[in-house]
């Protein structure tokens, strides 16, 4: 018997920036027992992220920006080193990530390669992230990057070996970034 889910109630607790739901549902377990659950679910939309790499120079492009949630959770400066990313906002993932790459890093990338889609925090967050990589070159630099409007983004071009070391030292603690850097290492796109 497969599990069945019956929605009992979906109450919106907040929709100031993203939407926080309080969801009550019945879950019919495999043994037939029905269990009522009440959970908060945070809907922030789906997103996309991309790691830019240069195989010849053996470098990657990352960004550093303030992330309030990390600051609240003990990251004293709130600064996080991560891959370029953004919410889809009704765009297709590839369209989104091309826009974000130009806005945040300044690079207008050519061919992008989609790797996978992952739920990063499925216990309470709806977001599905689309993961991409793309090779970049210096002549693809369209502007200085840094984000738009209220963003204050620092663009970092780092040796790939240094970025991997920064995972070990704790300087890089963003999940999507660690995944993409490890993927790049395992795939031997930079040797």
Curated annotation (Swiss-Prot):
Kindly list the cofactors needed. Answer: Mg(2+)
| Reactions catalysed | GDP-alpha-D-mannose + H2O = alpha-D-mannose 1-phosphate + GMP + 2 H(+)
* GO BP term, example: ribose phosphate metabolic process
Q: Which InterPro entries match?
A: NDP_pyrophosphatase (IPR004385), NUDIX_hydrolase-like_dom_sf (IPR015797), NUDIX_hydrolase_dom (IPR000086)
Annotated positions binding Mg(2+) 2: 100, 104, 151
User: What is the superkingdom listed in this entry's lineage?
Assistant: Bacteria
The UniProt keyword set, sorted, is: Hydrolase, Magnesium, Metal-binding
What are the binding positions for GDP-alpha-D-mannose in this chain? 17, 38-40, 67, 85-87, 104, 127, 150-151, 176
Specify whether Hydrolase is a keyword of the entry: yes
UniProt enzyme class: hydrolase
Presence of keyword Acyltransferase:
no
Tell me what this protein is called: GDP-mannose pyrophosphatase
Organism name? Shigella dysenteriae serotype 1 (strain Sd197)
